[in-house]
Design a protein with these regions (language model features):
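Surface/interface-facing alpha-helical segments and adjacent flexible terminal/loop regions used
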Residues: 1-51, 58-143
Protein backbone atom coordinates (compact mmCIF):
# COMPACT_ATOMS: atom_id res chain seq x y z
CA UNK A 1 0.00 0.00 0.00
CA UNK A 2 1.20 3.48 -0.87
CA UNK A 3 0.49 4.84 2.63
CA UNK A 4 3.20 2.54 4.04
CA UNK A 5 5.89 3.58 1.56
CA UNK A 6 5.05 7.22 0.76
CA UNK A 7 2.68 8.92 3.17
CA UNK A 8 2.66 12.29 1.38
CA UNK A 9 2.16 10.54 -1.95
CA UNK A 10 -0.79 8.66 -0.45
CA UNK A 11 -2.26 11.91 0.87
CA UNK A 12 -1.91 13.62 -2.51
CA UNK A 13 -3.44 10.65 -4.31
CA UNK A 14 -6.34 10.52 -1.85
CA UNK A 15 -6.99 14.25 -2.24
CA UNK A 16 -6.97 13.91 -6.02
CA UNK A 17 -9.37 10.96 -5.91
CA UNK A 18 -11.73 12.85 -3.61
CA UNK A 19 -11.66 16.00 -5.75
CA UNK A 20 -12.39 13.90 -8.82
CA UNK A 21 -15.22 12.19 -6.90
CA UNK A 22 -13.58 8.89 -7.71
CA UNK A 23 -14.82 7.43 -4.44
CA UNK A 24 -14.50 3.77 -5.37
CA UNK A 25 -10.70 4.18 -5.60
CA UNK A 26 -10.28 5.89 -2.21
CA UNK A 27 -8.45 3.96 0.50
CA UNK A 28 -11.31 4.49 2.95
CA UNK A 29 -9.94 2.39 5.80
CA UNK A 30 -6.69 4.33 6.03
CA UNK A 31 -8.39 7.67 5.36
CA UNK A 32 -10.78 7.12 8.27
CA UNK A 33 -7.89 6.04 10.49
CA UNK A 34 -5.92 9.18 9.58
CA UNK A 35 -8.87 11.48 10.26
CA UNK A 36 -9.43 9.85 13.64
CA UNK A 37 -5.76 10.25 14.50
CA UNK A 38 -5.96 13.98 13.69
CA UNK A 39 -8.59 14.40 16.40
CA UNK A 40 -6.49 12.47 18.89
CA UNK A 41 -3.48 14.58 17.99
CA UNK A 42 -5.36 17.82 18.64
CA UNK A 43 -6.51 16.54 22.03
CA UNK A 44 -2.98 15.43 22.93
CA UNK A 45 -1.64 18.85 21.95
CA UNK A 46 -4.20 20.57 24.19
CA UNK A 47 -3.31 18.32 27.14
CA UNK A 48 0.43 18.79 26.67
CA UNK A 49 0.26 22.58 26.34
CA UNK A 50 -2.14 22.94 29.26
CA UNK A 51 -0.02 20.70 31.49
CA UNK A 52 3.12 22.69 30.64
CA UNK A 53 1.36 25.97 31.38
CA UNK A 54 0.03 24.73 34.73
CA UNK A 55 3.42 23.32 35.71
CA UNK A 56 5.09 26.66 35.06
CA UNK A 57 2.32 28.52 36.90
CA UNK A 58 2.98 26.31 39.93
CA UNK A 59 6.71 26.94 39.72
CA UNK A 60 6.19 30.67 39.48
CA UNK A 61 3.68 30.88 42.32
CA UNK A 62 5.06 28.35 44.78
CA UNK A 63 8.84 28.30 44.44
CA UNK A 64 11.53 30.81 45.22
CA UNK A 65 13.77 30.23 42.21
CA UNK A 66 13.63 33.93 41.30
CA UNK A 67 16.29 33.60 38.61
CA UNK A 68 13.91 31.33 36.65
CA UNK A 69 10.76 33.47 36.95
CA UNK A 70 11.22 35.32 33.67
CA UNK A 71 11.61 32.11 31.67
CA UNK A 72 8.56 30.59 33.33
CA UNK A 73 6.52 33.72 32.59
CA UNK A 74 7.55 33.53 28.94
CA UNK A 75 6.59 29.85 28.79
CA UNK A 76 3.20 30.61 30.36
CA UNK A 77 2.50 33.44 27.91
CA UNK A 78 3.56 31.31 24.94
CA UNK A 79 1.39 28.44 26.18
CA UNK A 80 -1.56 30.81 26.58
CA UNK A 81 -1.14 32.04 22.99
CA UNK A 82 -0.76 28.52 21.62
CA UNK A 83 -3.81 27.27 23.51
CA UNK A 84 -5.86 30.25 22.32
CA UNK A 85 -4.85 29.50 18.74
CA UNK A 86 -5.61 25.79 19.11
CA UNK A 87 -9.07 26.53 20.53
CA UNK A 88 -9.73 29.18 17.87
CA UNK A 89 -8.81 26.70 15.14
CA UNK A 90 -10.75 23.84 16.78
CA UNK A 91 -13.56 25.30 18.93
CA UNK A 92 -14.99 21.81 19.46
CA UNK A 93 -12.04 21.19 21.82
CA UNK A 94 -13.53 23.60 24.39
CA UNK A 95 -15.69 20.93 26.09
CA UNK A 96 -12.64 18.64 26.15
CA UNK A 97 -10.78 21.35 28.10
CA UNK A 98 -13.23 20.93 30.98
CA UNK A 99 -12.83 17.15 30.87
CA UNK A 100 -9.04 17.19 31.13
CA UNK A 101 -8.22 20.37 33.06
CA UNK A 102 -7.95 18.77 36.51
CA UNK A 103 -6.10 15.76 35.09
CA UNK A 104 -3.59 18.14 33.50
CA UNK A 105 -3.18 19.89 36.84
CA UNK A 106 -2.63 16.53 38.56
CA UNK A 107 -0.01 15.62 35.95
CA UNK A 108 1.78 18.95 36.37
CA UNK A 109 1.69 18.59 40.15
CA UNK A 110 3.02 15.02 40.05
CA UNK A 111 5.80 16.06 37.70
CA UNK A 112 6.97 18.72 40.13
CA UNK A 113 6.56 16.56 43.22
CA UNK A 114 8.59 13.80 41.57
CA UNK A 115 11.40 16.26 40.81
CA UNK A 116 13.86 16.58 43.72
CA UNK A 117 14.32 20.29 42.95
CA UNK A 118 10.71 21.00 43.91
CA UNK A 119 10.01 18.52 46.72
CA UNK A 120 10.68 21.07 49.46
CA UNK A 121 7.94 23.40 48.24
CA UNK A 122 4.35 23.31 49.48
CA UNK A 123 2.45 22.73 46.25
CA UNK A 124 -1.36 22.72 46.57
CA UNK A 125 -3.29 19.49 46.00
CA UNK A 126 -6.25 21.47 44.65
CA UNK A 127 -5.74 23.61 41.59
CA UNK A 128 -5.46 27.29 42.61
CA UNK A 129 -5.82 28.54 39.04
CA UNK A 130 -9.09 29.31 37.25
CA UNK A 131 -10.40 26.51 35.05
CA UNK A 132 -12.46 28.88 32.92
CA UNK A 133 -10.74 29.20 29.53
CA UNK A 134 -11.26 32.93 29.18
CA UNK A 135 -9.81 33.59 32.63
CA UNK A 136 -6.71 31.43 32.52
CA UNK A 137 -5.75 32.37 28.97
CA UNK A 138 -6.38 36.10 29.24
CA UNK A 139 -4.60 37.10 32.41
CA UNK A 140 -1.49 36.67 34.41
CA UNK A 141 -2.62 33.66 36.39
CA UNK A 142 0.54 33.69 38.46
CA UNK A 143 -0.47 36.86 40.30
Amino acid sequence: MLIQTDYVGWLNETITLLKQKNFDQVDWENLIEEIESLGRSQKRELRNRLTTMLEHCLKLCYTDYVEDYRGWQETIRRSQRELEELLRDSPSLKPYWDQVFLDCYATALKSLRDNPDYQSFNLPDDCPFPQEISQILQKKVWR
